[in-house]
Amino acid sequence: MGLAGALAAVTADTWATELGVLASGRPRLITTGESVEAGTSGGITLTGTAAAAAGASLIALVGSSLGGQRLVISAAIGGLGGALFDSVLGATIQAIYYCPACDRQTERHPLHSCGTETVLVRGWPWLENDAVNFFASVAGALIAIGGWRLLG
């Protein structure tokens, strides 16, 4: 069950990121609702959230032969929960850097894509995007396990 939740979470996050850019409106920060630029860590759109739910549901449906409706519900909720947790971490404690040459915030460190050294502006320096993805997948697994137990 944990594996299904983790896979659903990473799929949901990927679909939200890749399809969320198709949204017509600007993303909003998950924590405050503030309008942010596309690509901002912690920014969400209705399109991206719907894509996350669809991605999580697809993984849950693939696993349905192993656990039926109980698995589908638990994994789908775990997947969406993990993806939303990823956004919360991105909006609050993920390391975000500033590139003075490009005048942009970025996740890249120590050098931005232009080759300029970046400076930490918020978050924990060790909590970069890969760590956020790891914690989000663990959250998806734990939520799915919790759902499995509650529905049992």
Predicted regions and their residues:
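Hydrophobic alpha-helical transmembrane segments
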Residues: M1-G152
